[in-house]
């Protein structure tokens, strides 16, 4: 990392190493084709940028596996349009505001990028990188962590790191349970909190997500129909849990979103706990 005026011929160095310039502008991305590193930030963030540069080069850098201590919160749509994506983004923003290094993304097939002003690479690109890593043997966990870290971007307002949604629903079709496990294990090594939004359609991928998550939250829209669909999902998970090994015990909660004067709560099974209601505001400025 160099001062620009002290390195008049950067191309002499960039052939053999990853080169970057110091910057005093927080949002500067490139200078004369070279990456920049913001000078006035925590040493840990500067180190993160070094890791990103090493991952982009893809060779000549020793990698190491970071300990997977991050905790995962999974939000599942109990019914279509229940607002689980908004609840996910709100949870991630709250955790980031507490000073936790937080990553947020959605695994929904047909989601749009409406939660954060700044997002990283799409989940389609993430899926491709995991696929390439597996083709190369899938052994070097540190290399995958560095690659994924380089694909994250931090939102200025909320300070949440995120990936953008899948480019097309067809991309998400090929994201299987093994890919999800690879993704979660890598992400848990580069953040303190990982907040994920997923469709409520039962699949091997969703069951793998629930097993890997520290907390799972079902989001209902507080209508009679939405509660019925959420109840069916909970009953299905209970049935799977009785046949499988402790899929849901002790970590399943329910949020009643858009709760107003006509809002309703479903009777929860004993293994699930109510986490509260999110009011339906009529005024946009209060939302």
Regions found by a protein language model. Give the residues of each.
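Short loop/helix-cap segments at secondary-structure boundaries that form the rim of catalytic
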Residues: 8-15, 25-34, 208-210, 264-271
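A short acidic, often aromatic-flanked loop/helix-cap motif at beta-alpha or helix-coil junctions
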Residues: 8, 27-30, 41-46, 168-170, ...
């Amino acid at each position: 990392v160099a001062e620009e005026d002290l390195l008049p011929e950067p191309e002499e160095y960039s052939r053999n190493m990853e080169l970057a310039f110091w910057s005093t502008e927080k949002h500067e991305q490139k200078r004369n084709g070279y990456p920049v590193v913001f000078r006035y930030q925590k040493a840990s963030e500067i180190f993160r940028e070094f890791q990103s540069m090493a991952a982009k080069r893809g060779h000549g850098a020793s990698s190491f596996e970071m300990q997977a201590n991050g905790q995962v919160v999974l939000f599942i749509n109990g019914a279509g349009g229940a607002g689980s994506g908004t609840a996910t983004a709100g949870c991630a923003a709250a955790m980031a505001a507490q000073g936790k290094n937080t990553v947020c993304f959605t695994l929904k097939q047909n989601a749009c990028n409406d939660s954060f002003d700044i997002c990283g690479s799409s989940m389609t690109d993430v899926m491709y990188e995991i696929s390439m890593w597996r083709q190369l043997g899938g052994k070097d966990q540190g290399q995958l962590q560095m690659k994924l870290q380089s694909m994250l971007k931090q939102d200025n307002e909320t300070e949440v790191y995120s990936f953008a949604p899948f480019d097309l629903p067809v991309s998400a079709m090929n994201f299987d349970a093994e890919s999800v496990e690879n993704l979660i294990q890598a992400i848990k090594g580069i953040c303190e909190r990982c907040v994920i939004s997923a469709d409520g359609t039962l699949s091997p991928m969703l069951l793998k997500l629930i097993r890997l998550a520290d907390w799972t939250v079902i989001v209902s829209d507080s209508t009679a129909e939405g509660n019925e669909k959420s109840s069916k999902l909970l009953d299905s998970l209970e049935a799977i849990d009785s046949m499988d090994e402790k899929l849901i015990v002790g970590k399943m909660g329910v949020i009643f979103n858009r709760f107003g004067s006509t809002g309703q709560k479903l009777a929860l099974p004993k293994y699930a706990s109510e986490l509260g209601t999110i009011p339906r505001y009529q005024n946009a400025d209060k939302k």
